[in-house]
């Protein structure tokens, strides 16, 4: 079963695309379902698909190096949770959130895969509730954009905004870490 054009348009990356063009995108996306704890994306993997979440909640996490008594080890740190509002998840998450929950009617993750072949996944994404989602592949999206170039401008602009926001956040994080490192060295 395919999502509706209206479901596609709820996702911020497609919100500026007219409804007829959203129908073209919907035609190449199949709705899938999964249970909590299913991993949708793995940090460090490469991919050419974007995940479109229509109902449910996911947790985004990153690998972090942690110092232990025996040296360093990798630990997974939750960064944020994303949750749909239209409709809300079918049930509460299995685990309580320890991070901020961002709500949106629907949302997309892995959007850089609509721009780059083999885009590197920058975080882990796991379902925390039952999920209804779809997969939009780069090949299908590229074919739609070639046939309907007006879609590309609106979507690529939203992806570029996302990249700029991520870069600004990363820059601030690097600055804070650098200051903390120098502070630790002077103690």
Regions inferred by a protein language model and the residue ranges of each:
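Short phosphate-coordinating micro-motif centered on Lys-Gly-acidic
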Residues: 40-45
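Short, conserved beta-strand element in jelly-roll/cupin
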Residues: 51-57
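Polybasic "coupling" helices that flank or enter modular domains
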Residues: 126-128, 150-187
């Amino acid at each position: 079963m395919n999502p509706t054009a209206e479901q596609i348009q709820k996702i911020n990356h497609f919100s500026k695309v007219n409804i007829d063009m959203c129908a073209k995108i919907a035609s190449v996306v199949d709705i899938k379902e999964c249970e909590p704890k299913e991993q949708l994306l793995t940090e460090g993997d490469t991919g050419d698909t974007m995940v479109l979440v229509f109902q449910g909640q996911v947790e985004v996490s990153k690998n972090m190096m942690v110092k232990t008594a025996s040296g360093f080890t990798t630990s997974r740190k939750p960064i944020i949770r994303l949750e749909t509002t239209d409709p809300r998840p079918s049930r509460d998450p299995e685990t309580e959130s320890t991070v901020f929950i961002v709500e949106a009617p629907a949302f997309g993750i892995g959007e850089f895969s609509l721009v780059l072949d083999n885009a590197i996944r920058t975080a882990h994404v796991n379902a925390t509730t039952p999920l209804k989602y779809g997969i939009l592949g780069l090949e299908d999206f590229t074919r739609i954009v070639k046939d309907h170039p007006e879609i590309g401008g609106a979507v690529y602009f939203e992806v570029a905004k996302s990249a700029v926001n991520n870069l600004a956040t990363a820059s601030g994080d690097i600055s804070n870490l650098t200051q903390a490192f120098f502070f630790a060295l002077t103690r």
